[in-house]
């Protein structure tokens, strides 16, 4: 029970921070463009606490702490863009009610480039948050740098077949610089059944080896049962935590975030092409389990209060940065309802000089919503299966 509560608190904290920053991105961009804002809510449902600032914005903390939203004046249906007839009717109503000058304060009457800027500001805020948090981690704690020297080649594995030898120093994988053994593991994990060209230093010279990772199933304490690519290499002993300087922290963190974005895009591409098993897709249950497992691990292993505090700060920062990158990327996908879907509609409007017709928007919205809900249900099924929930329930009746 305590473990579940830790998981729940960690999940709600991390998710609230990431989503609030995402919505603040939309909020600050809208303010910069002179858009009237009606409400900023942390969470959904009935407001528990609310107040108005001097600009008339209602700030709320709502009863369901899973997400949040910002609502602009006249944006009752935030999922779509009004068509020309709706815009004309809305403009006339605003003029009648508030006067001609008020029209320009409404989101839908801003130039299309400003609306696109407001839409993209949410994901960009997530990426900026991740960069700042990773920078703090790199300065305060550092990054683990394990040796890229091969300590052992497991017999009968792809690494053995490719000709790896103990003592080889791995320099590059597919011309990508390798900085630690974790880089190798992360790169290989997503490339099962894909040949990888390794540049290896051996006896003072560089040789190239081609190895194709095999797909294996592993039980992971944090992620549960996962299928990953594996070569059969083990690193040589040795490693250290290397801190970034204040000057290099932001560039180093930016590289970290960019690498994560490329990894997510590559993983999604392989999934869509059927090159990776779809049962590896994870959702909110998986995120919660990861948050709980990481936090529980810190609580159980900390020898004293100081170590516990440091471990909790590090783990929650790491979770916030990682989830922030994922949410920022996923929101840029060109699916109606998401920010990326709005950007597609604005691109059409910029080219056609008019918004997409309302019936097409409605159809796109329904299709996008169905796609997202279907994805969430499928991901939840995978998570429950990965953590053997169905096996446990079945055992109750046998």
From Swiss-Prot:
GO CC term, one of those recorded: plasma membrane
Entries under Gene3D superfamilies matching the protein: 2.30.42.10
Gene Ontology biological process: cell differentiation; cell division; proteolysis
Miscellaneous information on this protein: Degradation of PodJS is not regulated by cyclic variation of MmpA level.
Active-site residues annotated for this sequence: 23
Name of the gene this protein is made from: mmpA
Ranges annotated as spanning the membrane: 117-139, 316-338, 362-381
Protein name, as recorded: Metalloprotease MmpA
Thylakoid listed as a keyword: no
One MF term in the entry's GO annotations: metalloendopeptidase activity
């Amino acid at each position: 029970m305590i473990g579940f509560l830790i998981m729940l608190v960690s999940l709600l904290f991390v998710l609230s921070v990431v989503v609030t920053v995402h919505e603040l991105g939309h909020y600050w961009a809208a303010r910069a463009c002179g858009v009237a804002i009606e409400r900023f809510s942390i969470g959904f449902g009935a407001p528990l606490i609310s107040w108005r600032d001097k600009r008339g914005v209602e700030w709320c903390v709502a009863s369901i702490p899973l997400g949040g939203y910002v609502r602009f004046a006249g944006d009752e249906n935030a999922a779509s863009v009004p068509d020309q007839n709706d815009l004309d009717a809305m403009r006339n109503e605003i003029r009648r009610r508030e006067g001609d000058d008020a029209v320009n304060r409404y989101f839908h009457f801003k130039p299309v480039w400003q609306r696109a800027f407001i839409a993209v500001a949410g994901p960009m805020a997530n990426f900026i948050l991740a960069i700042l948090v990773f920078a703090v981690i790199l300065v305060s704690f550092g990054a683990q740098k394990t040796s890229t020297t091969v300590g052992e080649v497991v017999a009968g594995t792809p690494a053995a077949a490719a000709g790896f030898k103990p003592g080889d120093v791995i320099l590059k994988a597919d011309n990508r610089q390798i900085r630690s053994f974790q880089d190798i593991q992360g790169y290989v994990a997503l490339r099962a059944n894909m040949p990888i060209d390794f540049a290896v230093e051996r006896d003072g010279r560089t040789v190239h080896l081609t190895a194709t990772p095999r797909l294996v199933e592993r039980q992971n304490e944090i992620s549960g049962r996962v299928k990953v690519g594996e070569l059969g290499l083990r690193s040589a002993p040795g490693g250290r935590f290397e801190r970034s300087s204040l000057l290099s922290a932001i560039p180093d963190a930016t590289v970290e975030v960019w690498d994560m974005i490329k990894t997510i895009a590559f993983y999604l591409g392989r999934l869509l092409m059927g090159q990776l098993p779809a049962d590896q897709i994870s959702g909110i249950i998986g995120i919660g389990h990861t948050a709980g497992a990481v936090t529980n691990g810190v609580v159980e292993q900390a020898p004293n209060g100081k170590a516990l505090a440091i471990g909790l700060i590090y783990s929650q920062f790491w979770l916030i940065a990682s989830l922030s990158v994922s949410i920022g990327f996923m929101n840029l996908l060109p699916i109606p309802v998401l920010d990326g879907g709005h950007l597609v509609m604005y691109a059409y409007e910029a080219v056609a000089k008019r918004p997409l017709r309302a019936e097409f928007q409605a159809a796109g919205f329904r299709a996008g919503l169905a796609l997202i809900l279907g994805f969430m249900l499928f991901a939840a099924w995978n998570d429950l299966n990965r953590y053997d929930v169905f096996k446990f329930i079945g055992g109750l009746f046998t």
